[in-house]
Amino acid sequence: MSSLKESMMSVNEVDLHKLQIHDPFLGQYQHLVRDVVIPYQWAALNDRVDDAEPSHAIANFRIAAGQQTGEFYGMVFQDSDVAKWLEAVAWSLCQKPDAELEKTADEVIELVAAAQCEDGYLNTYFTVKAPQDRWTNLAECHELYCAGHMIEAGVAFFQATGKRRLLAVVCKLADHIDSVFGPGEQQLHGYPGHPEIELALMRLYDVTQEPRYMALADYFITQRGTQPHFYDDEYQKRGQTSYWHTYGPAWMIKDKAYSQAHQPLAEQQHAVGHAVRFVYLMTGVAHLARLSQDESKRQDCLRLWHNMAQRQLYITGGIGSQSSGEAFSSDYDLPNDTVYAESCASIGLMMFARRMLEMEADSQYADVMERALYNTVLGGMALDGKHFFYVNPLEVHPKSLPFNHIYDHVKPVRQRWFGCACCPPNIARLLTSLGHYIYTPREDALFINLYIGNRVEIPVGNQTLGLRISGNLPWQETVTITIDSTQPVNHTLALRLPDWCASPQITCNGTEVNEAARKGYLYLTRHWQEGDTVTLTLPMPVRRVYGNPLVRHVAGKVAVQRGPLIYCLEQADNGEQLHNLWLPASATFRTFEGKGVFAHKVLIQAEGIRKAAREPEQQLLWHYDQAPALAQPQTLTFIPWFCWANRGVGEMRIWVNEA
C-alpha cells in the first residue's frame, strides 16, 4: 500500500471551461439537463408543474427576504433544492453560455443574499418560522446541511462565471458558522446531524485558501461521536423536544448510528446509518485527509470504503439496503425488492470515489464510480428528463405495491417531483459536472478514469496537454485518445482498465502496448506530440454475474452485464411472472440495437425457460411431491436497467433464476 506522502501528491481540479463533453451517449444527457431538466426544475421550484408535489422553495426565500408575505412551506431542508439547482446552472454555463439562464441565476443569487441575516446566518426555515431556535437542533434540523449546499453553489458559480456575489454570501455564512462552532467556551461544541458542510468547507478552502475553513471541517469531523454526546446535550437544553417523529420521539437523537455519530470516526468499522449522510461525510473526510496529510483519517477512509464496497454495495452501484432510515443494513444483507438505494446516495458515492481517487491512484474507486453513474444515477431520471426515482429497486412487482406496506417507498414509475425533492437537482448537478470525474490530474500523470467522449486542456508545468477522447461507450468497445497539443509535452497518461473487461488491448500509434498495469492503471510516458493516438479496445461480451454466497437474496440466480451496464427483464418484453423465468447455464447471448425509447441502445436476448401452469388461479396454493408448473421455451429479452419503467407500469427484475 502506498504511503500517505506518495498518495498526497498535488492534484489539480479540471477547469470545466477547458473541457467539452461530446460523448454520443452522456453528451445527450448533458444536453437534456441543460435544455429540459434545468428549466423544468426551475418551474418546479416555483410551483409551476401541474400534478406535482409543491416545492415553495423560491417563495420561502422571498418571504425570508421580506419580499413576500406568507408562511414557510416544505421540508426543513427545502433551501438545499435551490442551492443544488444553482450549482447545476453554474456547471451548465461552463458548457454553453446562456445569458438568459445566467440572468435568472443572478436574480436568484440576489434573492439569497437578501434573505441572509446581518450576522451571516442563512436559512429560510428558521428565519421565517423559528428565529429563536437557530442552532438549537443540529441533530435533526439540517441547518449545516443547507449551509453546505449553498456553499457548494457559491463555489461552483464563482468557478463557472468568475462572479463573486454568491461566493461572498457563502463566505459570510461560513464565517458566521466558524464563530458559532469550535472549542471555545462560548462556542457550540457540535456538528451536523446530516453531514454536508464538511465537504463544502473543503471546496470553499480550495478556492479561498482560507485555513479557518479547513480547520472548521476538521473540527466537525473530529468532534463527531465524542462523549459527552452533543446531541444529548442540545436535546436537554431545548426541553427534550424533537422535530421528527417518524420512528417515535427523538429517534434521531437516540439512534446515533443513523447519523454516523455513535462513535468517533476512528473507531467506526462499518458503513452504517443513513447512506447519503455516510458518503457525504466520507467525501469531506477524504478531501481533508489528502490536503492535511492526515494518515489516521486516510486509514478511516480506506477501512470504511472497503466495508461499503465489498459487503454493502449493490451490483447497480446503489447503497442503502433498507427503507427504515434510508440506511445501510448489515454485511451482505442486500434485498432486491425492498432495497432503498436512493439516487442521492449513488451521487454521494461518486463524490466519495472521486476524492478517494485523488488520494490514491487505484482503479477500484473508478470502477465503483462508473458502476454508480451508468446504472443508478442515470436510472434515477427518465429519458424525458421530467420524471425521477428517489428509490431504485432491483426488482418490482407492481400488483403488490398498494397492499404490502413494506414497499411503501417503492414506485413502479418515476415521479414528476417530490415533497422531499433532494434527488432531481442532485442528478442535474452531477451530470453537468461530469468533467470533474473523467480525469484526475496529478503532477506526475494524468489519470483517465472514465472513457467519456470529450476534449480537454490540462496544465502540465508551464505547458498545456490537449487531448480528445472519442468512442461510443457503453455500447461499443473502441476508445480513441488523440493528442491535440500544438507543442510537444512530456507527460504520463494513466489509463484505467475497467474491472468488467477481461482482455483489454492497447496500442500507441499502432504499436501494441504490453506494459503491466499497476492498481488497474496502465502508464504510458512519452514525449506526446499532436496527432499521437492511443487506442483502447475494451471487449464487452455479455457476462454472467454471480453474488457472494453470503448474499442470500441472489442464491441460485444470475445477473447479466455488458460493459458497465447492468441489464434487467421487464414485463413489457417478457410477460408477467418474471419470477417464473429461468436462464439456462448453457444459454448463449445475442445483442441487437433497440428501437423507440431504446434507439441506439444495445439489448440482449437469450433462449430461456418459463415454468408455467394452466390456470394457476384455479389450482391449490401448495402441492405435494410434484411441482405444478411445466417448462416451456421462451426468448428472454434484457434491457439496460437504467432504462426500465420508461414504458409504463410493469414487473422488473435484475436477478434471474439460473437453470
Regions found by a protein language model. Give the residues of each.
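A conserved hydrophobic secondary-structure block that centers on an alpha-helix together
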Residues: K129-V207
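Solvent-exposed beta-strand/loop surfaces of large extracellular or lumenal domains
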Residues: C501-T525, R544-L550
